[in-house]
């Protein structure tokens, strides 16, 4: 369980993740140690701009560069697909995640407003405490 992590009931279901990977087959990554997945990142683009989603590393595998390597691999894949800008959303309460992005030199954007319009009310977000 990842603390401060938001999971959507439909988008983040097995079927939702499979659909995302079918649309972006070369940009999402997993980290494997001793035959088990210890980290993962969903990464996709629309041909212009990319987004990173659900970057996570199991707690007992953190501080070993796994998250950083996952991000680097995704950025390399995006560059090879001629993508020049990547966005991500880190929830304010996800202190660990926000520190991670800052440590990698990602820029906090205070010049934009983030909006969303919900098309499916059943696709609810549940946060891990």
What do these predicted regions represent?
Residues 32, 55-62, 90-91:
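A short, internal acetyl-CoA/4′-phosphopantetheine-binding micro-motif in the GNAT/acyltransferase core
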Residues 78-90:
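Conserved GNAT acetyl-CoA-binding A-motif
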Residues 18-30, 51:
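A short helix-loop-beta-strand connector motif used in the catalytic cores of GNAT acetyltransferases and
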Residues 59, 88-97, 116-119:
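Conserved beta-strand-loop-alpha-helix junction that forms the acyl-donor binding cleft
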Residues 1-21:
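Conserved GNAT-fold acetyl-CoA-binding loop/helix
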Residues 30, 36-44, 51-54:
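Conserved beta-strand in the GNAT
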Residues 44-53, 62, 109-112:
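A conserved beta-turn-beta hairpin within the catalytic core of GNAT-like acetyltransferases
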Residues 54-57, 63-76, 99, 103:
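Conserved acetyl-CoA-binding loop-helix of GNAT-fold acetyltransferases
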């Amino acid at each position: 369980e990842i603390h401060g992590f938001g999971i959507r009931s439909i988008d983040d279901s097995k079927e939702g993740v499979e659909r995302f990977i079918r649309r972006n087959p070369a940009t999402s990554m997993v980290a494997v140690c001793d035959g088990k997945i210890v980290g993962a990142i969903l990464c996709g683009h629309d041909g212009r701009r990319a987004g990173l989603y659900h970057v996570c590393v199991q707690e007992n595998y953190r501080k070993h560069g796994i998250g950083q390597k996952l991000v680097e691999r995704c950025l390399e894949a995006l560059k090879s697909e001629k993508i020049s800008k990547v966005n991500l959303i880190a929830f304010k309460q996800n202190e660990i995640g926000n520190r991670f992005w800052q440590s990698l030199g990602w820029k906090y954007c205070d010049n934009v407003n983030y909006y969303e319009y919900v098309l499916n009310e059943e696709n609810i977000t549940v946060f891990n405490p």
